[in-house]
Amino acid sequence: MVSEAPPFWWDKPDWRALSLAPAAWLYGAVAGRRLLKAEPPKISLPVLCVGNFTVGGAGKTPTAIAFSAGAKARGLNPGIVSRGYGGAYKGLHVVDPAHDSARYVGDEPLLLARHASVALCPDRLKAARHLQALGCDFIIMDDGFQSARLFADFSLLVVDAARGIGNGKVIPAGPLRAPLTDQMRKTDALLRIGKGDGADFVIRQTARAGRPIYEARLKPSSTTPIAGNRWLAFAGIGNPEKFYASVAEAGGEIVETCSFPDHHSFASDDIRNLTDTARRQGLGLITTAKDQVRLATMIGVPAGFLTKLAVLNVDLKFDRNDALDHILDTVIERFKSRVTS
């Protein structure tokens, strides 16, 4: 899996995408066949897959958190299955948010573990069974749509409204993990997050395929006042522009930005440079919740840096009040039909 998306993937197709077309065709043929022909193993629990069509950030983490909260509100005990991108564990591991570090389990699982039990394992079936043994009765699969490692009763694909699916090409010519037509055949519904027309093409394709389309937005929040203050905003996530837009939406004035690779492991020089730049210009430092969990578990990060750091959290809010419950109802109904048939 490609961990860092080249910038040209998000622009109109150019000579680079064209030159990589043969490799993209081969990659797409293999990925598409695996997606369509595989028969994923099943578990005797309802499973919701939260995935996306492309490499890069789309909003899966806040979506998984929202469904975890929704399941808990029903009296369920949700568990989240993840591969743990950005971490060092290769076997089965249940994330302990009080003791694990992002270096070993990854930033997203550590953030998710604040909201539900999280099991990491390349074998998602094994992870789901372990969560079942721990008492979980509803599984949320964080990513894994293309892997076919665990059967999902419902697959919700997340797309960023501004970014969409980039140039619409398959890896390595573009960000798609498999041909869109193949992915659409396995998609149960689409969730468009935010504002913008970048996802218009995939929205049209989803509508033509007869799949339901849901709309949501990310509502920013922070324990630190954001509005009216001047910031140096930094992030090491898949789509930092979405974070910068959220800071502006919260009323913050962004004077400087600093973007790092996705899942970036911050070094002492990074922290020193950020601190010096902010001090020279009289700016506050603000980052994402994912970056904060990495920084908080790093060895050698000055305590003063963390206490002065503002963190912008985002909560997923559906445009329709009944949307989340409708999806949960569908997952559970499909599961009941599956186990009784």
UniProtKB/Swiss-Prot annotation:
What family is this protein classified in? Belongs to the LpxK family.
Recorded catalytic activity of this chain's protein: a lipid A disaccharide + ATP = a lipid IVA + ADP + H(+)
Protein name, please? Tetraacyldisaccharide 4'-kinase
Gene Ontology molecular-function annotations:
ATP binding; tetraacyldisaccharide 4'-kinase activity
Q: What SUPFAM superfamilies has UniProt attached to this entry?
A: P-loop containing nucleoside triphosphate hydrolases (SSF52540)
**What role does this protein play?**
Transfers the gamma-phosphate of ATP to the 4'-position of a tetraacyldisaccharide 1-phosphate intermediate (termed DS-1-P) to form tetraacyldisaccharide 1,4'-bis-phosphate (lipid IVA).
Q: Where does ATP bind?
A: 54-61
